[in-house]
């Protein structure tokens, strides 16, 4: 049954060819967010997976991870903490850099956003090369969190990110996958 629900989500995601550059197919979750039934199904897939786990917080990766992460935290009666792009948080922060195709980027969190030993679920919308998610995992661990699992709506396994994440020992859950050429 979960497969049917995941397939509904997958069918609702819009594929935009040649955006933002030629040869890239962008996976757009906004149709999922616009349709209350499908958005509810998406959130329920995550809720049913995590409702019996002993979690303390949900962390969401900037920016679309905020949408799903905050709603999921609310549904699970947990706190939510943002993992932001560099220079977006007003208080004391700690950062983790990661490599991009043409340079570096960084994610940040407030130094007081998690406590040592807290069990955290990390959420984002999509995993491609895995750089942002890996940096967020490292950042949470540096702050003392136990990253129970990383989760995303979409996995693009042919880009290698999901394999890199699981290679760290962090379990990974994704609602749907797209293979190259899908």
UniProtKB/Swiss-Prot annotation:
Q: Which GO terms describe its molecular function?
A: adenine binding; adenine phosphoribosyltransferase activity; AMP binding
Assigned GO CC terms: cytoplasm
Q: Looking at the keywords, is Lipid metabolism present?
A: no
UniProt subcellular location: Cytoplasm
Which pathway does it take part in? Purine metabolism; AMP biosynthesis via salvage pathway; AMP from adenine: step 1/1
Q: Which reaction does it catalyse?
A: AMP + diphosphate = 5-phospho-alpha-D-ribose 1-diphosphate + adenine
Q: What class of enzyme is it?
A: transferase
Q: Which SUPFAM superfamilies match?
A: PRTase-like
Q: What is its main location?
A: cytoplasm
Q: Which PANTHER family match?
A: ADENINE PHOSPHORIBOSYLTRANSFERASE
Q: Which family does it belong to?
A: Belongs to the purine/pyrimidine phosphoribosyltransferase family.
Q: What is this protein called?
A: Adenine phosphoribosyltransferase
To which species is this protein native?
A: Bordetella pertussis (strain Tohama I / ATCC BAA-589 / NCTC 13251)
Gene name, please?
apt
């Amino acid at each position: 049954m979960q497969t049917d629900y995941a397939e509904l989500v997958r069918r609702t995601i819009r594929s935009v060819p040649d955006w933002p550059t030629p040869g890239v197919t962008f996976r757009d979750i906004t149709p999922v967010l616009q349709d209350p039934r499908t958005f509810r199904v998406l959130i329920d897939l995550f809720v049913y997976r995590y409702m019996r786990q002993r979690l303390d917080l949900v962390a969401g990766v900037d920016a679309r991870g905020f949408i799903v992460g905050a709603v999921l935290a609310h549904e699970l009666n947990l706190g939510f903490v943002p993992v932001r792009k560099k220079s977006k948080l007003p208080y004391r922060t700690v950062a983790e850099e990661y490599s991009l195709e043409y340079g570096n980027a960084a994610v940040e969190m407030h130094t007081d956003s998690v406590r040592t030993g807290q069990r955290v679920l990390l959420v984002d919308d999509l995993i491609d090369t895995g750089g942002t998610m890996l940096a967020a995992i490292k950042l949470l661990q540096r702050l003392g969190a136990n990253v129970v699992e990383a989760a995303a709506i979409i996995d693009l396994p042919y880009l290698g990110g999901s394999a890199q994440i699981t290679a760290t020992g962090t379990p990974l859950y994704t609602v749907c996958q797209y293979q190259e050429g899908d």
